[in-house]
Amino acid sequence: PNIGTGGGRDYLSAFPGSREMLTRYDVVFLGDVGVGRGQLSAKDAELIKGLVEQQGSGLVFMPGRRGNHLSLMDSALKELMPVELDDARPTGVGLQNESVLTLSNRGRGHLLTRFDADEMVNDQIWKMLPGFYWSTGVIKSRPGSEVLAVHSELRNQWGRIPLLAIRSAGRGKVLFMGTDSAWRWRRGVEDKFHYRFWSQVARWMAHKRHLAEKEGIRLSYTPETPKVGDRVFLQATVLDEAGFPLENGEVKGEITWPSGDGDQLDSDQLEITEDEGGWGVYSAEFLPQEGGPIEITISAP
């Protein structure tokens, strides 16, 4: 807000303000942007929430020094924020001395914070990364969130201040990065750590949307490696011929698994229902009858 617009081949002149336009995006990054004039609208916030919860996209909160992110707490996105923000410090906290992100026990073994397979080496890398002087005002993490890294110097009655935290939201994932200085990780090593971190974030967030994808249908399933007796939940995002989310469509599903003798195939129809919200999401569930490769076919005639 209040700065000149950019340009370029992939530049967006305006926010994709409809389900049809937004559904193509795997990850949304929100910097020093809130809800207000020249920024997001309340409807935009609701669309982002729907994209994450219904279609399994990712959302990254990256607050800045203007404090615009606090206005998001009066929007639909409040429920998705992994931390409780400190509204008494709208412009964040600045220190004279450099601080660093300190990995939590959860962060030491998480994919997003892994620069080396050896946890001890990885921990040393994080300690040596160029630090920061400014951070978002945060009180604590919210219930259901996982804290991957905390402020090396600041703490309150709740403990160390969480600056890197994640949480699930419906079918999607959300990440909060409470410092704007990750770009400094390029110092002396170019994009070795900076690029790797953000590429890991993007892949982690977009993973479920691309488990199976063909001809306007994306299929995701939980758990990804089911065992006999585990109930499997399927979500199919279906687009119409124009590439928009299919509403009130006829979506069919069939599950095929090998029979006990391994030669003859047996199949059943899946009972598929459309989820509310108009995001083109259709759901089904089943119990695996036996081990082995299972084939799932989803079609929208």
Feature annotation, model-predicted:
Residues P1-P301:
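N-linked glycosylation sequons
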